[in-house]
Amino acid sequence: MTSEQIKMARAAVGWSIDQLADRTDVSSRTIKRIEAQVGLPAATEANLRLIRETLEAAGIEFIGEPGEGPGVRLWTKQN
């Protein structure tokens, strides 16, 4: 999961940085720092796991490989 994917996923579910922070117990400052990076984020494994699991629970699927155009897909009840 890349920094860009986190930012795309957050936008897809319509959450602000503060909303993601509230849902994950990861500080908004940390999320801002992660999203400002390029590629694979330098962050603790625990924080990245919390972010991933929270976004996946909201319907996000992380697709692609970091070096091959990674993206996200939002699954809804209609998919």
Role assignments for model-derived ranges:
Residues M1-T2:
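Absolute protein N-terminus
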Residues I6-Q19, K77:
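Short basic helix-loop element that most often maps to the first helix and adjoining turn
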Residues A9, R23, I34:
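Residues in the recognition helix of alpha-helical DNA-binding motifs
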Residues I17-S27:
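Short, composition-biased local secondary-structure segments
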Residues T24-D25, E45-F62:
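DNA major-groove recognition helix of helix-turn-helix/homeodomain DNA-binding modules
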Residues V26-A43:
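Recognition helix of helix-turn-helix/homeodomain-like DNA-binding domains
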Residues I60-N79:
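Helix-turn-helix/homeodomain-like alpha-helical modules used for DNA recognition
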